[in-house]
Amino acid sequence: MRLPGRPGGPGGSGGLRVLLCLLLLGSRPGGCNAISAHGCLFDRRLCSHLEVCIQDGLFGQCQVGVGQARPLLQVTSPVLQRLQGVLRQLMSQGLSWHDDLTQYVISQEMERIPRLRPPEPHPRDRSGLVPRRPGPAGELLLQGIPTGSAPALQHRLPRPSVGGGRAGAGSPLSPLQAELLPPLLEHLLLPPQPPHPALSYEPALLQPYLFHQFGSRDGSRGSESSPGMVSVDPLPKAEAPAFLSRAGSKGMFGAHPGHSYGDPPGPPPAQLFQESELFYLAQESQVPSRTRAPRLPEPGGSSRAGDSSEGYEEEGLEGREEKPPAPAEQPDVTLQRVAAVLAGYGVELHQLTPEQLSTLSTLLQLLPKGSRQNPGGAVNVGADIKKTMEEQVQGEDPAEPPPPMPSLPGSPTGSSTSNKAQKELSTGASEPPKAAGPPATPVLVEKKSPLGQNQPTMAGQPSTRPSAEEYGYIVTDQKPLSLAAGVRLLEILAEHVHMSSGSFINISVVGPALTFRIRHNEQNLSLADVTQQAGLVKSELEAQTGLQILQTGVGQREEAAAILPRPAHSTSPMRSVLLTLVALAGVAGLLVALAVALCVRQHARQRDKERLAALGPEGAHGDTTFEYQDLCRQHMATKSLFNRAEGPPEPSRVSSVSSQFSDAAQASPSSHSSTPSWCEEPAQANMDISTGHMILAYMEDHLRNRDRLAKEWQALCAYQAEPNTCATAQGEGNIKKNRHPDFLPYDHARIKLKVESSPSRSDYINASPIIEHDPRMPAYIATQGPLSHTIADFWQMVWESGCTVIVMLTPLVEDGVKQCDRYWPDEGSSLYHVYEVNLVSEHIWCEDFLVRSFYLKNVQTQETRTLTQFHFLSWPAEGTPASTRPLLDFRRKVNKCYRGRSCPIIVHCSDGAGRTGTYILIDMVLNRMAKGVKEIDIAATLEHVRDQRPGLVRSKDQFEFALTAVAEEVNAILKALPQ
């Protein structure tokens, strides 16, 4: 647990800390800073650059150099409980490891922990052998051990090393081991008791700093990991030995000298015994090609519960050097010391159960590994032992078999290997133990690894050579994959394959991949079986973990290098090449399609211009144009089409005279409505062939003369309508109802709503009536695209004006810019104030426009009307359609639906000016010609509609497009006339 480094609270907390520090300064010489820093395992900054962090078994202590011996601490559960309370109090005061008060309190608590005496040297004779005469322990052995119990224990107690590969694994019990045995025997002999809740320490206090020192339990991983790889301990086993179950309440561990603060700290007391036992068991190399021989139960039906070595290989001692047997009368010093310690508890060897004998044998295998320290050089030897253990963990040479586990007496064996092992065990037991001399300093020898790196190894040890081992892996979509998620995934996988979670070892994460190995299990499942089963239950694993499993399989790893996975389904190089070629072909095809589309569009524009050039009949260019202009001059005195006096023509205007051949009285008040037409052919018009040809010739000359067209457009831009005030639209309450501030309705020509029916209690809407020839009945209503807060006003205008046709000339969104808000429901019905709009149908007529049908209902009066919307899609905001044909077909479709109606047509785009004015101009001119009006002054018609709404037809291109569309329609009418 890391103490937070936050400052102490204000007020009395800081003053109390200063007062306590002053009291401590007076009671301890040197002040607070004289205390050696504790907690360097939790905070690396405590030690200076001249100090190293020494592993004291608890918090770590800063020390200059590593040559001093550290005493062994006897840490029990009450000690841990007290330290836990002290840490809580310090943390509640806002203290951190850097505070002097924290260091002083921790130092005082550390001094209260009992120490173990360092091992004393044995009296030795000149020959270096243990005196033949047994000491007091031998007398106790003769007094308290029956003759029949000694052989039984001899099979369980560790023997002297046969091959010399591991010094100390079978050494006689030293005084230090006798010191360590009493607490261990308490775990062994006393019945297990449930821990008291008050005495159980919280794992969260020490959890971030307590992890395995050497990475894995089976010894396949070295102390160095590849970059990006984080290892976790194997999952807890289903059953643990009896003495391990109480390791959390009582623990013995030595404060052996450690490494600098950069190295990982040591394990907690509860984990030390379990990790040490598993480390001993992991020293047996697991050769995949050899068969595993599980241990057989002891005679009498009792099995070794919690035996961690069950399922491991039993390897013979072939190839080991046999020592000559010693005299049989030499007593076993190990038996003497064990009997002496047991006698102190009033227990004799024959009273121990087989399970206790097995556990005691395992304990004695563990103790020599920590007792190879001499009093004078404890620190250096401890570091060497750590280095030796790490090298042993990194990999065993398969050619050098490890020492076997002590077998049970009377266990039936069915192979010559186990018989030979028992023979050599008995031979080693009768050999007189040699006196343990001072351990020599290990010599480091450079050896070449398969990867070409020099690695130090211990002189006198067999050279290690890592072998390629297979690892199972599960690749997920989470990068990097957290350790908790990986462990959770393996736990769920263990449930699905009916395995114990402890069967998974060497758990690591490499980016998004989880790697693991499998112990020998009851189901005899291999790595391939487990990974295959993981693929079968992939959906269940993903559902329970929230991860997406991308791949499972088996791979290999060498000397902490990154795992090289072998995918289950590898992609052939030819397939990759084909996929690349297909992708390139797709990109090339897309580019070609875009190029073709651009060419087609450009060709369509050019074709339209060429078609306009060929509209008129041959030989009728100059003469017909002159005759048509002369006819127009003859009717200058007639009544104007727009019921207003015509002024003198402007000098800059070309052919601005407006005339008509027919009498003005022919137009009735109800004849303003459009004449129906067909999409295939134009309507039959009251136009003779000669008049039509003259109109075409005039239009052709008008379009070919670019200077005349430019001057005409300049004159239109300079035209100002009278009156032209827009005060109502610019009012404070109405300005937010305008989509564009430059296109507002005139005060004298605007649609007025009924105030009593309006949700905003206002009669304003940005809409203008467009009158063709009858002021009492407008032919069009030009309006802007509704805003989100003016949709109800829009439907009120539709209802009050009696409109049944809506012409929409803009998409809702163009180039990421909203052009118009959706004022109709996507499906079903929507209520806008008191008007319920129900979408009946939506028919895509072609790629350029679609048609929608609505029911419009007034929920107050329960009256219902039908309504049709024509939506043109291919008209850009600032431009013109690519061709006039789609718009002319669209207009014919609108007029066919509008046949016989006497209500205005609502026309809108985004701003209600550019595209709206162009469509109204084209439709108005063509409707006049269809009714027999023999005049074709499009400029004068545009001035007429601009008198009623400003900004109609915003650009010269739109004006030229209107001229072209009129010429196209006239040409189509002439072709439809009988010759």
Curated annotation (Swiss-Prot):
Residues 113-127 have a biased composition (Basic and acidic residues). One of its GO terms (biological process) is positive regulation of type B pancreatic cell proliferation. GO terms for molecular function: spectrin binding; ubiquitin-like protein ligase binding. The chain crosses the membrane at residues 576-600. Keywords: Cell membrane, Cell projection, Cytoplasmic vesicle, Disulfide bond, Endosome, Glycoprotein, Isopeptide bond, Membrane, Nucleus, Phosphoprotein, Receptor, Signal, Synapse, Transcription, Transcription regulation, Transmembrane, Transmembrane helix, Ubl conjugation. Residues 1-34 form the signal peptide. Detected in pituitary (at protein level). Plays a role in vesicle-mediated secretory processes. Required for normal accumulation of secretory vesicles in hippocampus, pituitary and pancreatic islets. Required for the accumulation of normal levels of insulin-containing vesicles and preventing their degradation. Plays a role in insulin secretion in response to glucose stimuli. Required for normal accumulation of the neurotransmitters norepinephrine, dopamine and serotonin in the brain. This is Receptor-type tyrosine-protein phosphatase-like N.
